[in-house]
Amino acid sequence: MEIVRKLEASFPVLEEAGCKVGIGVATGADAIFIGSDARLEVEPERKLPLITTKDIRNGRVEWGGNFVLNPFEADGSLVDPDKYPKFRAYIERHRELIQKRNVAGRNPKGWFRTIDRIHANLTNTPKLLIPDIKGSAHVVLETGHYYPHHNLYFVTSETWDLKVLQMILSSRVAHAFIAAYSPRLRGNFLRFQAQYLRRIRIPRFENLSKSLQKETLAAARSSHQGEKDALVQRLYNLTDLDWSRLDPSILTA
């Protein structure tokens, strides 16, 4: 699309503008690695509160109470099970099923690891959560209490206010980028995967004037959608005609 190409020539991609895109943890055996606090009978430091797509389906965080086993130390190395008797007992109890996973076959010594390495500090990092398959962007702010499941993508930033970033990633501009690159599924659903999210272009916050930064922060906290739309249009220097052409109902027609 012509407008998308113009934006690509004018703005950096998300990860060049102070943001990081990632995906939550895949375990290979959710029935064993995921459960309630009481069901995962391991040491407190060997489990993390887990957030899933179901927990944000209403547009806000409504935690379902699940945890995920964390077989990694803070430095990224696998734990020594002998240091955690409850954890060792739990994985030994489920050893047969855990070892059937492909990741266990490739890592005999680390047979109890999750498919993806867990970085526990992500739990306490404020982030935006985005489900994989949606008809439109579903971007939820999580203020730093949960670790994301593998069906959720996350965006963090040290330069952008996350409420502002949420406003931008929920806008028709972000939708246009996803629609331009994602395969379209039945029912006009799109894939909001990391590879497509990374294609989204945004301004660098530090390049905005002080007055525009202030207005942007105010608009992001407004309950008026028209105010948010007008601000995003200004951030991208879009004409009224270009803005109208990005209407999702037109893009999906």
What positions do the PLM features span?
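Amphipathic alpha-helical coiled-coil/heptad-repeat segments
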Residues: S171, L208-A253
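Polybasic, glycine- and aromatic-enriched phosphate-binding surface used to engage nucleic acids
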Residues: M1-K214, R234-Y236
